[in-house]
Amino acid sequence: MNKKLILALVLITSCFIAEAQYFTGFSIKSYRISSVWPTSFRSLRGSVTASIGNTGDTRKMSGITAKVYRNGKPFAQGVCEDVTFNKGTSTYTLNGEVKLSDGVSTWDAIAAALSFRVSEYTIDFTVNIKHPDGKMDYVVRAGMPLSHYLRR
């Protein structure tokens, strides 16, 4: 079961990192899972270390959430702690938590891990972006196929 939650953490974090490339001035140089530890049978916390280039001004991203759907049904949801991206290329640690959705049992997660097909998964993603001038953007990406992020 922990393998499936690790997969969900990787998916959500990878999507956040991949989605960041769509914000003007961001480029992802590299990323890796730094740590993963279970918080229960249905959730885990973890961190990803990423090298991110930002050619724009410093921006703070908050309210970072993602929901993973399997065959159109809620499967897992995750949140990432707020992060500030400074101008230039720097290494950041992104911390987050992933939980299985209500109605998804540990056995469902194990079965999904054993029969994983990328075509079965879609992701909703939201983030608030605060610019140096105080302007806030609320970004929503809904129903994006997981394959969209894995091709990057």
PLM regions: where:
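Terminal connector regions
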Residues: 101-152
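Low-complexity, acidic Ser/Thr/Pro/Gly-rich terminal tails and inter-domain linkers that flank the onset
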Residues: 21-44
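Short, solvent-exposed loop/turn segments enriched in Ser/Thr/Gly
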Residues: 42-49, 122, 141
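Sec/Tat signal peptide C-region and signal peptidase I cleavage site
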Residues: 16-20
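Conserved aromatic beta-strand anchor motif in extracellular beta-sandwich/beta-rich domains
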Residues: 68-70
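Sec-dependent N-terminal signal peptides
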Residues: 5-14
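Intrinsically disordered, low-complexity Pro/Gly/Ser/Thr-rich segments with frequent PxxP/GP/PP motifs
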Residues: 72-108
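Asparagine-centered strand-capping/turn motif at beta-strand->loop junctions
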Residues: 52-58
